[in-house]
Amino acid sequence: VGYEKLVGLISELHTEELDPEDLNRLFMEFVEKVTDLFGFITAVYCDSAEQVLIRGLRTAAAQRNKGDLKIANAKKNRINDRIFCFTSLVAQNRFLYTELCETLEDALSMAVWKPDTVELERLDDGTSDIDTLDGFEYSYERDMKKYMNHVE
């Protein structure tokens, strides 16, 4: 597909209390699920504020013979830039997602702007799934310019 369309393939949300070992196990189960369904993963981008957890994910990947999987810090572009890129793709019918993206669909449908402010700021008060939105945005933010500059 190149940069013609952005396609959400699969999403999961785990709301239970997780310790680092649980996180590593669930992460590797997700990696296996994605590779079984779609063939391969080249990179995973994580919230840079979680360096200890990122090191744990790298260790878990290496222990499961997935040491070639790039697990790196997200670029963390401005949130509004990520949102505007995504909404532009939606407006141009350039965003698709599979039936395996129920949690992403829910997160996108519940995202709202913070009320009572003139600034465009996404509401982050626990009423919507910001973690899924951030994770999804981290997956395409490094390529935003390529998506926005794509000409058919």
Where are these regions (language model features)?
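Acidic two-metal-ion nuclease catalytic site recognized across multiple nuclease folds
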Residues: 141-152
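Mg2+-dependent endonuclease catalytic cores in nucleic-acid-processing enzymes, primarily RNase H-like
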Residues: 2-125, 146
